Amino acid sequence: MEKRGNFPLFSSSLSFLLLILFKENDIIVVMEKKKLRINMLSSSEKVAGQGVSGAYRELVRLLHRDAKDQLIVTENLPIEADVTHFHTIDFPYYLSTFQKKRSGRKIGYVHFLPDTLEGSLKIPFFLKGIVKRYVFSFYNRMEHLVVVNPMFIEDLVAAGIPREKVTYIPNFVNKEKWHPLPQEEVARLRTELGLSDNQFIVVGAGQVQKRKGIDDFIRLAEELPQITFIWAGGFSFGGMTDGYERYKKVMENPPKNLIFPGIVSPERMRELYALADLFLLPSYNELFPMTILEAASCEAPIMLRDLDLYKVILEGNYRATADREEMKEAILEYQANPAALKELKEKAKNISREYSEEHLLQIWLDFYEKQAALGRK
């Protein structure tokens, strides 16, 4: 190796680049790390209107934008990488884990467990056991798992996955996309929908399925005809959706005060959040709903069913309700008490700050660095 003085010159093929900067008669040596290559594997965007695709795109967008000096992020490429991040559990991805080619550290993203599919998809009884075994077999093929729901950790441990192989990293949203709209824009939207300035509006969002509490949302609209209800979302999985035929009939002939706009664009969804006097998600079972983070980022007051998950991830920054009757009472309370509604709106801002891009970016960078280092051992 050629030398000049006491400073060796490294070739560019090595893991570190030696940058020599001359300042007067001094030589400053800066060591620059080689970028990590992260290969994302996901088919989530093939299915519109479901949260996994939104969470995936937000992460990839953030890393491309703000981590380009540390990471090279690729998507669905058959290449060598420091970390291969599996976002969905497609069978071809499962088979790829047995290949000898260097995929680096294999990371699995746990967006659901077999039990959470109940009330979402219509799975024939004879297939349920097969699906459960496949899901856990896929997760076991991973060298580390990331959960978006901290409640999943105990379930994974109970299924035989070592606790030290599981890390909780929450979802987040892009504040450039999800933000409040000016009052004049909100007024225009109300006019567009034929709603007066003082009409109280409750907005919900998500796939139309039993697990989301859509039955309670419909009943609330029937019991509160003076309130306008809007549910954005549809049947992302078509006829496989649990209760598809029944909900399809309701969507085709809803109560007069209930609007089903279907699966909408992010731009339209932002407008609906802006219209909301109250955002209501009456789900019985949730993973880590992107809709809550989106609504909070748009400063919509949040009301939810009282689930253990929310107590952990939202820390009281929402109105908890035990059942449909409590939801009904709370809606009437907020309609009559603007001060209480304003207080709930301030709590939504706390949620938005907690799950900021800046905070989560550093968490992901640290995580990928650690996992890549383990993969090199």
What are these regions (language model features)?
Residues 316-326, 333-339:
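Conserved acidic donor-binding segment of nucleotide-sugar-dependent glycosyltransferases
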Residues 205, 228-245, 262:
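Glycosyltransferase donor-sugar binding loop
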Residues 126-145, 248:
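Membrane-proximal helix-turn-helix segments that form the acceptor-binding/catalytic region
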Residues 284:
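Aromatic "clamp/platform" in nucleotide-sugar-dependent glycosyltransferases that forms part
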Residues 263, 271-276:
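Short alpha-helical donor nucleotide-sugar binding micro-motif in glycosyltransferases
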Residues 243-267:
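Nucleotide-activated donor-binding/catalytic signature segment of Leloir-type glycosyltransferases, i.e.
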Residues 301-304:
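Short hydrophobic beta-strand element within catalytic cores of glycosyltransferases
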Residues 190, 196-212, 218-222, 230:
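Conserved donor-binding/catalytic core segment of Leloir-type glycosyltransferases
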